[in-house]
Amino acid sequence: MLRKVVRDARLRARVLERVEEFRLNKRASERVWFRELVLCILTANSSFIGAFTALQYLGDLILYGSIEEISSALKNAGYRFPNLKARYIIESRSYYGKLREIGRVADRDQIEAREILLEIKGLGMKEASHFLRNMGYLDLAIIDRHILRFFSDYLEDQKISSKSKYFELESVFRSIASALDLPVGVLDLYVWYLKTGKLAK
């Protein structure tokens, strides 16, 4: 089934277009990088649609709003954990101006760049990988519930109980990507489509 999806010429064109959008983000401003960081903080324990909607409500508050203003905007967006995420967003501002530097680390070693991102409160392995993929770095797996559902077809134990388990599943995903001659981040788009019928992520 996966191989059939990967061979679909029309879908491949859409995937490559999406990948090009990610790669263009590498050259984007620090403001764009920070917006993507906040989006990834918001996606933790939330749906992408819920996180994206919340980000639209926030607007420039991510840069200039107080913790109370951010929390209020998140509540108005119907977002879960508004107080916690407001605090994470405020604290993440200390990385504004440093994110493209992390990108330069990713140019030589994406795993090292992900480790740096893990120091940001609100980011786990999945969210840090998601951020890097959205900024054009395609060698890391975003192991979310859709990818775990994909793994359930092949593996008995696919729960992420630790960082080492994430690495283990990422290694399996990397092997599948290699067999299909695809970067890990591109295979992720195909699997996401296979499990949701959608391409955006």
Curated annotation (Swiss-Prot):
GO molecular function: class I DNA-(apurinic or apyrimidinic site) endonuclease activity; hydrolase activity, hydrolyzing N-glycosyl compounds
Record-level GO BP terms: base-excision repair
Catalytic activity: 2'-deoxyribonucleotide-(2'-deoxyribose 5'-phosphate)-2'-deoxyribonucleotide-DNA = a 3'-end 2'-deoxyribonucleotide-(2,3-dehydro-2,3-deoxyribose 5'-phosphate)-DNA + a 5'-end 5'-phospho-2'-deoxyribonucleoside-DNA + H(+)
InterPro entries: DNA_glyclase/AP_lyase_Ogg (IPR012092), DNA_glycosylase (IPR011257), HhH-GPD_domain (IPR003265), HhH_base_excis_C (IPR023170)
Gene3D superfamilies registered for this protein in UniProt: Helix-hairpin-Helix base-excision DNA repair enzymes (C-terminal), Hypothetical protein, domain 2
A Pfam family of this chain: Ogg-HhH
Alphabetical keyword list: DNA damage, DNA repair, Glycosidase, Hydrolase, Lyase, Multifunctional enzyme
Site residues by UniProt (Important for guanine/8-oxoguanine distinction): 201
Active-site annotation: 126, 144
CDD domains: ENDO3c
Transmembrane segments: none
Domain of life, per lineage: Archaea
Function: Catalyzes the excision of an oxidatively damaged form of guanine (7,8-dihydro-8-oxoguanine = 8-oxoG) from DNA. Also cleaves the DNA backbone at apurinic/apyrimidinic sites (AP sites).
Family per similarity comment: Belongs to the type-2 OGG1 family.
Protein name: 8-oxoguanine DNA glycosylase/AP lyase
UniProt source species: Metallosphaera sedula (strain ATCC 51363 / DSM 5348 / JCM 9185 / NBRC 15509 / TH2)
